[in-house]
Amino acid sequence: VMNVPVTFPPQRNVQRMVSGFLSPGIDKAAYPDELRDYLQSIDYKLDANPKLGHDEDKSDFIEDAHETLDARYEAFKHYIQQDDWDLFFGVFMTTDRVNHFLYKHYEEDMEYKDEFVEFYRKVDRYLGEIRRNLPDDVTMMVASDHGFTSLDYEVHFNQWLADEGWLSYEDDDHEDLNDISEDAEAYSLIPGRFYINLEGREPRGSVPESEYEAKRDQLKEALENLEGPNGRKVCDRVVEKEEAFHGDHEDIAPDLVAIPNHGFDLKAGFKGHDDVFGHGPRNGMHSFDNASLFVDDPDATIRDVDLYDIAPTILDLMEMEYDAGEFDGKSLV
């Protein structure tokens, strides 16, 4: 298991594992020690340096992205060929970084379009080489957990809530959730999560239970009608928590989730901004309707696919018994 985001600390019950995004470093993120030593010997990086993408000149960022990708491929190739494994799960995360800082260059024929395309040619070549080196009885799957689109505006939703009278603070020096006032009626967390400041649930709750439905409906309507400076609706849709969340911890689910239209990146933060709509260093953002999936199996049916379908598909391909009722998804094979 190599470089899966948010998997630190590495599990000790798998053959090899290096955790990915949000890990403190290879020294602590890799198990066993032999894996750590090998990764360090090839200058393996857990992630490209996104701060380099903030510069107007993207040359250093692009060079760092290639170095990260090259070492990732070398490590994948090494262990795919060396080890006897049942499941090899690896993540090329550098595509996400490149998309965040170069995607608009690609879509709108800007300065770094050629560098963007050349990076993806290399990704494609590496995937092809991995596929060619796999034994005949191994099925290769390539999946992304989201798509990408050009970014036009960052939307600072807590500033919008403050401007519209939903959110207020104890004083002018505010920077986190603890600083909201007892009069606040709603607040937002990334990405696009909205919470009614409900009495009995929130530490400084102000909205009585009897007013919850009406307040939520009012906020939902306001979000659905919100337009950006370009006249386009910010939200593709706004989903109530009963529709989106189920399980043992649904009590902590947001009351509303805003799904953005392409071009709007939904932000939160409690420090305040001069304007609701702004621009940051990124020009590409996640999208939710154009993720990709490739299954190298003639029996695979890829229609109406959900991210949840990947786990039962892998179990089927590995001929593992499982209770289909325990999974939200369904096997594609």
Which role does the model predict for each range below?
Residues 1-5, 170, 175-301, 307-313, ...:
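Active-site neighborhoods of enzymes that stabilize oxyanions during catalysis
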Residues 16-38, 108-117, 158-177:
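Acidic, His- and aromatic-enriched active-site or binding-groove loops in soluble protein domains
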Residues 87-91, 141, 294:
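Structural motif
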Residues 1-108, 185-186, 190-205, 211, ...:
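His/Asp/Glu-rich, glycine-adjacent segments
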